[in-house]
């Protein structure tokens, strides 16, 4: 038996939960099938039939028990039975759950996080690589090191200083030679002479090896002097 209530179709089970929607004949038939005695004055009034149906014939969760000793006893049994069903349902859900349920009560807000240190883990990767062959690091570490190690560190830096001084001397000599070959001052060009006259004597520049030897012997003032060309 299916009905239409408020433009919505209702199944038989839904109609059994709402006895006010059932007809008076259906209520009487249901009470007779349940072997519930119905008096003559109750048969006439539909409200009395619905109350009797709610007390005895409606499905158990929605049934209103009478307020007597039997009704109180049945209510206690119902509550005990519902509590058992809840515990069984909760244990089944916990068994299906992979992880336990975490409940935050708000009492502890600051928690300390512990990180397990590994022997050869991420800590070694975070360390900077050791720098080798740098004189600055060796000089920086020398005050903290012992007195025996300090002279060795200073001696190791001496060859580098000697090389730097030698390179500076070479560049200075090359600079002086270029200044000698191309003097910065203006040089007077000789007038053109006719063919057949006496040859002009020019002072030729010394070779490179002789120039280096003379540069070592001469004082620095002689290097900077401009050589003038002499004419006969």
Swiss-Prot record:
Subcellular location(s) per record: Nucleus
Name used for this protein in its record: Ashwin
Alphabetic keyword roster: Nucleus, Phosphoprotein
Record's GO cellular component terms: nucleoplasm; nucleus; tRNA-splicing ligase complex
Entry similarity comment: Belongs to the ashwin family.
Skewed-composition ranges (Basic and acidic residues): 74-97, 116-127, 163-179, 206-224
Record's compositionally biased regions (Polar residues): 131-148
List of residues that carry Phosphoserine: 112, 182, 184, 189, 193
InterPro entries cross-referenced by the UniProt entry: Ashwin (IPR024887)
Modification Phosphothreonine, positions: 197-198
Main location group: nucleus
One annotated GO biological process: embryonic morphogenesis
Subunit structure: Component of the tRNA-splicing ligase complex.
UniProt-annotated stretches for the region Disordered: 74-99, 113-232
């Amino acid at each position: 038996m299916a009905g239409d209530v408020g433009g919505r179709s209702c199944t038989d089970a839904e109609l059994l939960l709402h006895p006010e929607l059932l007809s008076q004949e259906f209520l009487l038939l249901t009470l007779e099938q349940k072997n519930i005695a119905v008096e003559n004055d109750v048969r006439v009034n539909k409200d009395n039939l619905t109350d009797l149906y709610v007390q005895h014939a409606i499905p158990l969760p929605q049934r209103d028990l009478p307020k007597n000793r039997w009704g109180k006893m049945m209510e206690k049994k119902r509550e005990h039975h519902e509590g058992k069903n809840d515990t069984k349902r909760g244990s089944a859900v916990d068994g299906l759950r992979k992880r336990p349920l975490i409940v935050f009560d708000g009492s502890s807000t600051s928690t300390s996080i512990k990180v397990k240190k590994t022997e050869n883990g991420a800590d070694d990767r975070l360390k900077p690589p050791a720098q080798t062959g740098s004189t600055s690091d060796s000089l920086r570490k020398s005050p903290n090191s012992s007195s025996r190690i300090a002279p060795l560190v200073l001696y190791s830096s001496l060859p580098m200083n000697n090389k730097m001084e030698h390179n500076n001397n070479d560049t200075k000599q090359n600079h002086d030679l270029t200044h000698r070959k191309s003097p910065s001052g203006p040089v007077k060009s000789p007038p053109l002479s006719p063919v057949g006259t006496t040859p002009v004597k020019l002072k030729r520049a010394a070779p490179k090896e002789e120039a280096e030897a003379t540069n070592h012997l001469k004082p620095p003032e002689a290097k900077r002097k401009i050589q003038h060309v002499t004419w006969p």
